[in-house]
A protein has these predicted regions:
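Structural signal for interior beta-strand "rungs" in well-ordered beta-sheet cores
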Residues: 162-262
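Terminal amphipathic alpha-helical/low-complexity segments used for targeting or macromolecular assembly
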Residues: 1-173, 180, 259
Length: 262
């Protein structure tokens, strides 16, 4: 399988301040980061083309065969199928914006040096569904659908454990619990979308979750919290009170029960 390189473009400016410290593809939408989604779909490790001051941490690694992918694009099964069928020097476009290109090392080196390189065969993506982050509001607006897509992807590789019997659950077959999660005396309603509970996460007594919802590894949902659909609680977060259609990135806390987020 070709190497993966995820690149930033002008969309980065619309995702500030979050992209001051990371490439676009390191944003979490749904359960996984955009980079992680591509790595799982293409079974390869990704590297980055981003701003110079981030390159020390997020460097580039290229090979003789590379998928050059827009870092704000979320892979869908339909898009991934087309990507796997690409030939060298083909490029998929949407409204003249580059989505994916397949480049050899020589072409990629010329691109990075801003040298002239061989023309690519541009193919407009018409009727191919996929999600794309164009502005900050897309992170939560598209989050519910991204959770659904990630669950379909993770089901292929994970063995989830059964929800403990002390909880009240609706649509239990749409509740996905990683090993090591602690859930006791909670209310989980997955009739409108899946609920994902990550490894070592803790959902305390009286918490209410209405899917689609994702609780990241090591996160804590406090007693009596109300987590509504379209919400991701990131790794190591602590969440309390009422949270609606929101994305809490790693190590963010919302403990107050008096104020609503979302």
């Amino acid at each position: 399988m070709p190497n993966i390189i995820l690149f930033d473009n002008d969309v980065r400016e619309k995702l500030l301040p979050l992209t001051f410290t990371r490439p676009n593809c390191e944003l979490r939408v749904g359960i996984l980061r955009i980079r992680e989604k591509w790595e799982k779909h293409l079974n390869a490790t990704a590297s980055f083309i981003t701003h110079d001051y981030l390159a020390g941490k997020y460097g580039i690694d290229y090979d003789d065969d590379n998928f050059f992918i827009n870092g704000s694009v979320l892979p869908s099964p339909e898009l991934v199928t087309l990507v796997k069928q690409m030939d060298y020097n083909e490029a998929f476009l949407q409204n003249d914006e580059l989505i994916v290109a397949r480049l050899d090392a020589r072409q990629l080196e010329r691109l990075m040096k801003d040298d002239a390189f061989e023309a690519l065969k541009g193919i407009e993506l018409e009727g191919t569904p996929f999600l794309k982050i164009n502005q900050l509001t897309d992170l939560y607006r598209l989050n519910g659908e991204a959770i659904r897509q990630d669950i379909e992807l993770l089901q292929k590789e994970r063995n989830f454990v059964e929800l403990p019997g002390s909880n009240f659950a609706k649509a239990k077959d749409q509740i996905f619990v990683e090993e090591g999660a602690e859930i006791s005396g909670a209310y989980l309603n997955a009739t409108e979308g899946p609920i994902y509970i990550g490894a070592q996460a803790k959902v305390m007594e009286g918490a209410m979750l209405r899917g689609p919802v994702a609780i990241g590894d090591h996160a804590t949902v406090r007693m009596g919290a109300k987590i509504y659909g379209g919400t991701t609680i990131g790794r190591w977060c602590k969440a309390g009170g009422e949270i609606v259609e929101s994305v809490l990135l790693e190590y963010a806390n919302k403990r107050s029960e008096e104020r609503r987020v979302g």
